[in-house]
Amino acid sequence: IANMLEGKAPLSIRHAVFLAEWAYLDGNLDYEKDFCEPIKKGADYLRRLIAVNHWEKYKTAKQIALCNFFFYPCSGNGQKPFEYDFSNEFPEDDWRYQLVSRTIKIHKGQCHSLPWTFKLYAEELGANVSLAHAPRHCFIMYKDEDNLFPENWVNVEITAQQYQPTWAIKEHFAISD
């Protein structure tokens, strides 16, 4: 991470997330197998999905494809969309359930790991999305360059598999202007 910050290595959110999780797991994580391979495979599928559906005409085709990949069963995600993990399999002091590597592997996660996983797939695909934070929560935002939504920015609530208007996010999280 220091090399990225000092300009000695290219900036990579994927590599930074991997390094943090690798350290947390005492080195029991493989960058290629656990991060690169599944993300590259997913991005390759998304490129084909865009082409087959003729979504290239949309400036936000990559974002549309990502939402489909995360929300709906398809061959590219093994017929297993990414879902909120309601299980309580880890105690409160065990953060493994929050890890992006776990979400990539089992397609289940929390309000931290699901949006970060989306961001890593977006980075590989070249889709311009941003991580947005609310109190104790995280979601995805991207500019609506195709005017498909009533607002200039699209808020993607990965944990609920839906789009959220800005007013709803502000109301739910008690955010003011």
Q: What residue spans do the PLM features occupy?
A:
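A structural boundary/capping signal
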Residues: I1-D177
